[in-house]
Amino acid sequence: MARRLSLLAVVLAMVAAVSASTAAAQSCGCASDQCCSKWGFCGTGSDYCGTGCQAGPCDVPATNDVSVASIVTPEFFAALVAQADDGCAAKGFYTRDAFLTAAGGYPSFGRTGSVDDSKREIAAFFAHANHETIKFCYIEEIDGPSKNYCDETSTQWPCMAGKGYYGRGPLQISWNFNYGPAGQSIGFDGLGDPDAVARSPVLAFQTALWYWTNNVHDAFVSGQGFGATIRAINGALECDGKNPTAVSNRVAYYQQFCQQFGVDPGSNLTC
């Protein structure tokens, strides 16, 4: 009897596991053996089950044992936010605790490759954040409400009346086609309440890391260099000679942070 009950328990556990996987995949409308990609499409293979996979039998990326908190020390982060003067909108908004809480949901960030690779990726992330927020002075894009970031061709992520999808947070996430999937992945109403990113420092870092993980991480850790991260973040407006000053500023911050972390910045720094 006991053996039969044990067997029954094992069977029930297996059924529960399969049911959980099925429910996860079905949250995006996918079959149980399919993954919901970062863009909300169903399928199999690395394009669907790799980076950014939201549900289903997602691939689990290999990570090293680096502690992101040991690299982003209290002293490093304090120096970052100290750049913002008292008149800055973001003064007191961005915190190390918020960053580390957000980073906990992205285990591949700063933990892929060698220890030096980890340091370079973290330096790259904060170089862009430093540039985008103008040294951590801003939460929202300057004059953002006056700008139109609604791509009406993105029918999967339709814009909502009265909502502005301008830049917010450390990487200034923009456009409805980014707010929508970011909200779906993280768990907030990105299309209906994009302002939520500017109200919560944790959510601000989560959206930045969501964008980084889905659009920047793979290019950087594959050895394409810092220049590839510029192209992934704002290449259309800065790369190929469009805005050399902005590119130079990003590179300078990256080199500065690499020096602080004691790591060589590598090659292919520009775009």
From Swiss-Prot:
It comes from the Eukaryota. GO terms for biological process: cell wall macromolecule catabolic process; chitin catabolic process; defense response; polysaccharide catabolic process. CDD domains: chitinase_GH19 (cd00325), ChtBD1 (cd00035). Disulfide bonds join C28-C36, C30-C42, C35-C49, C88-C137, C150-C159, C239-C271. Keywords: Carbohydrate metabolism, Chitin degradation, Chitin-binding, Disulfide bond, Glycoprotein, Glycosidase, Hydrolase, Plant defense, Polysaccharide degradation, Signal. SUPFAM superfamilies: Lysozyme-like (SSF53955), Plant lectins/antimicrobial peptides (SSF57016). May function in reproductive organs during embryogenesis and seed maturation. This is Chitinase 6. It holds the Pfam family Chitin_bind_1. Its EC number is 3.2.1.14.
